[in-house]
Amino acid sequence: MPEMVPAWVDGRLMPVEKLEAHQRGLRHKAISVFVMAGESVLIQRRAAGKYHTPGLWANTCCTHPRWGEAAADCAVRRLREELGITGLVTVFADQVEYRADVGSGLIEHEVVDIFVAEAPQDLPVAPDPEEVWETRWVDLHDLAREVEEHPERFTPWLRIYLADHMERIFGKLRVVQ
């Protein structure tokens, strides 16, 4: 059964098959999570088998909520499914909208609810190899520099978050600690 995501069609929010939303460049809902340990962020390299942006580095996890699923529930679900992470408190940080070509004729036009969570760097992580190639902790400012110097290694959305929305996302995190 195809995965149905919330997308806007003719101004109405309705369930649309995920691949169709990307093929048509429809504006759709998404979530992104950043797990932080102080000034370090856990990032993941997307699995080679992903249908877009395979092998590129992204934030801790990101996905689309299922039709009828709350964004906060989706964030917790994907931390568990992609990385085996449970028990973290995710806090809504901001909402960002962007549109980006992700290759192979696919467009991400997302309205993204962004969540942050604090964790120790020794947090147990068990990546699902279908989703995640590898993970690493990196200082947030080092990551921003790395993205600027080697943008081809990173997903379009991570580049956008760090270039255009870093203070909006991570400034609020410092208040949460």
Swiss-Prot record:
Active site positions: 62, 110
Keyword match Magnesium: yes
UniProt keywords, alphabetically: Chlorophyll biosynthesis, Cytoplasm, Isomerase, Isoprene biosynthesis, Magnesium, Manganese, Metal-binding, Photosynthesis
SUPFAM superfamilies: Nudix
Residues reported in the UniProt entry to bind Mg(2+): 82
Bridged cysteine pairs (disulfide): none
Pfam families (UniProt xref): NUDIX
NCBIfam families: IPP_isom_1 (TIGR02150), PRK03759.1 (NF002995)
Name of the protein: Isopentenyl-diphosphate Delta-isomerase
Organism: Cereibacter sphaeroides (strain ATCC 17025 / ATH 2.4.3)
